Amino acid sequence: MTNLPLWEVFFRGTVAITTQILSNNVVLIMEPVATVKTAAVGFWFPVGSRHEGADQRGVTHFVEHLLFKGTATRSAFDIALAFDRIGGYLNAFTDRESLCLHCVVPANHLAKALEVMVDMVSNSLLEHKEIERERAVIQSEIVSSQDDPEETALDAASEAVWPGHPLAAPIAGSVEEVGRLSRQVLMDWYQSHIVRGPLVICAAGNVDGDFLLKVAENLPQRGVCAKNWLGVARSNGWQGTGPVWNSGLQFKDAPFRQMQFFLQLPACPPVSARDYYCWAVANAVVGDTMSSRLFQKLREEGGYSYNVYSFMTHYSDTTCWCAYASAARKDSRKVVATLYRELNLLKEEGFTPDELEAACQHVCGEEIIAAEDIDYRAKRLFRHHSLGFPQATTEEIVDLIHSLTTEDVAAALNKLLDFDKASLLVYGNRPTESFQKKILALV
């Protein structure tokens, strides 16, 4: 008997992913999975907080909320009830470069779900009373987020490396900025970017491709979708500038008991799926797993931190890698010293074959487990599209990860670990001058 690799056993026979650009400029991407009884669909619009002007801060997030507040033929309750009655899930989110309306439903109810979603992105009323009610809700959401140490710190970390740039602005805006948004501004944004703007529809699961195609073809004419998300924005009139990286040591006072540390480094955006997954494997070696260098040194051996991890954030024209840790004030010097020491060791001595094997298996395992989630598959379709990558099945991705060599990952790490470009943000309660000098001596 031939022993097949695990990923071949799981994914042999996957139906091909299809991408179609329709006459109305809608992009339709589908990954049929006949073995499931659910369907996931996302409507993706290439507009986010990054694309807002100074007098429009928070408008995309505000419009996202208003999609649920009623159309010409459905009340907000009707929209909610339509999904509750079928046991489905409908939600939306705004990011810095996109807005997404997405659902997961039993496959036999997909037609009803799409009918409601199309209505929401075509005929929302944005009534004055709903705007004022939701304005208060969003302002409450913003105030609540300011009580979350990690959320406020993440915004501060973005501001540290891209000061004054829209990529660093809070996605929801401030309480004052949301308070200034008029119905006319909201309606203009909705009409320009949601009703008539570029649209990518990503669907995965037990989907009827012919039916989805008919739904997409019946949508009104849209803006042109280019090969990647930056190109889409540019081709539809956005004239924003790219972010300029700001390195160095910064301290920010915050009313929280623990100190938080963000060591950030810039990277070029991945130009291929191979680049993307190479970064993922490198990140797993450094800090993304419990067996990673930083987790072992800062938590398991040092006992300094409960929260230790690293992550990469990809935008259309830049990438940021970040190592994060939180600790008691008394352990601050040890945390910073350990961060720099371990990263320098990785740069000078590299990693072991066992570390690389473990990291590759970890990233493969994540993909295999995540692929059980149809919503994840639909979002992965969009990720590949927005970054300009060819679509790939789980099997193809796992094969790609296993093809990465020690040289591939080492080159990625060496390129990343340029400490002349490092930005360290120390975020916490009353960083005194004496405290700052002690940290400065370590970097």
Over which residues does each language-model region extend?
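Short hydrophobic-aromatic micro-motifs
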Residues: 27-30, 252, 261-263
